[in-house]
Swiss-Prot record:
The keyword Disulfide bond applies. Antimicrobial peptide. Active against fungal species B.cinerea (IC(50)=5.2 uM), A.niger (IC(50)=2.6 uM) and B.sorokinina (IC(50)=5.2 uM) but not against F.oxysporum, F.graminearum and P.debaryanum at concentrations below 10 uM. Inhibits growth of P.infestans at concentration between 1.3 uM and 5.2 uM. Active against bacterial species P.syringae, B.subtilis, X.campestris and C.michiganense. Keywords: Antibiotic, Antimicrobial, Disulfide bond, Fungicide. This is Antimicrobial peptide 2. One of its GO terms (biological process) is defense response to fungus. It comes from the Eukaryota. Disulfide bonds. Expressed in flowers but not in leaves, seeds or roots (at protein level). The lineage of its organism: Eukaryota, Viridiplantae, Streptophyta, Embryophyta, Tracheophyta.
C-alpha cells in the first residue's frame, strides 16, 4: 500500500505519489488507488 500525502505546494495540483497506484488531488485531498482513474480524472 501507500499513504496519501498532500504536503506539496500549489493549489489544486494533481500529483502522482511514489506508489504507482496512488495519486492525490488538492485541495479536496481525494485519493485514487486506480492508476487509470488518476490519469483520467480532472483535478478538483
Amino acid at each position: 500500500g501507500g499513504k496519501c500525502t498532500v504536503d506539496w505546494g500549489g493549489q489544486g495540483g494533481g500529483r502522482r505519489l511514489p506508489s504507482p497506484l496512488f495519486c492525490c488531488y488538492k485541495p479536496t485531498r481525494i485519493c485514487y488507488l486506480n492508476q487509470e482513474t488518476c490519469e483520467t480524472e480532472t483535478c478538483p
